[in-house]
Amino acid sequence: MKLKSFGVLGNPIKHSKSPLIHNACFLTFQKKLGFLGHYHPILLPLESHIKNEFLHLGLSGANVTLPFKERAFQICDKIKGIALECGAVNTLVLEDDELVGYNTDALGFWLSLGDEGYQSALILGSGGSAKALACELKKQGLKVSVLNRSARGLDFFQRLGCDCFMEPPKSAFDLIINATSASLNNELPLNKEVLKGYFKEGKLAYDLAYGFLTPFLSLAKELKTPFQDGKDMLIYQASLSFEKFSASQIPYSKAFEVMRSVF
């Protein structure tokens, strides 16, 4: 049976559960796919040229994580779906010798929320994940605000119709979303007292990091604010990516079931 290589490109990467859940799917569906897929964690140096690395490694598809999602958008031969709007790519697929970029973070995040009737969101951070979330939340009709320590990237969110801040706004929000990398460094993304104020009035504290109780989520727990880590988002976006890797042979709902069973 033909072997195809896939992977997740990032820095850092050792924390990623993507190889676990994708390899479970490749094993489960290999007969239907007609090939054996193997999915690797790939640590890229920060200065890497993503397309060159992808082709050099002989990959058929890959996920892209911190800090390469915006750079991945720039190197694709073709961009499809909501990735066109959000300027960030987390899924790369080789299709007819062209490198095609997708974004499954956006819908993956929304599916992970459930239908709770949220009206407003504060996104902390302005990177590729934040862009995808803002696009999807605006599409779903929420009022979206973005808080970042610098002006870097905020022009994108302004064009999208978000309220943008470099100092914490004195408002209440249903969703407070940590889309920064602070949790990977075991840090809070924002001043503790400011976060407490948001959590006390918010409906859900959401951290895109997963696999451990981050300082952000620990504070929410302390204040008895409902909280959620990025595990469900990971599985939803991964199952949507797997559908792309399988050329739509495996619907994301089937991939989701397998991934959920192993993580």
Swiss-Prot record:
InterPro entries: Aminoacid_DH-like_N_sf, NAD(P)-bd_dom_sf, Shikimate_DH, Shikimate_DH-bd_N, Shikimate_DH_fam. Pathway: Metabolic intermediate biosynthesis; chorismate biosynthesis; chorismate from D-erythrose 4-phosphate and phosphoenolpyruvate: step 4/7. Shikimate binds at residues 16-18, 65, 90, 105, 210. Its EC number is 1.1.1.25. Keywords: Amino-acid biosynthesis, Aromatic amino acid biosynthesis, NADP, Oxidoreductase. Gene3D superfamilies: Leucine Dehydrogenase, chain A, domain 1, NAD(P)-binding Rossmann-like Domain. GO terms for molecular function: NADP binding; shikimate 3-dehydrogenase (NADP+) activity. NADP(+) binds at residues 125-129, 208, 230. The keyword rRNA processing does not apply. Involved in the biosynthesis of the chorismate, which leads to the biosynthesis of aromatic amino acids. Catalyzes the reversible NADPH linked reduction of 3-dehydroshikimate (DHSA) to yield shikimate (SA). This is Shikimate dehydrogenase (NADP(+)). It comes from Helicobacter pylori (strain HPAG1). The lineage of its organism: Bacteria, Pseudomonadati, Campylobacterota, Epsilonproteobacteria, Campylobacterales.
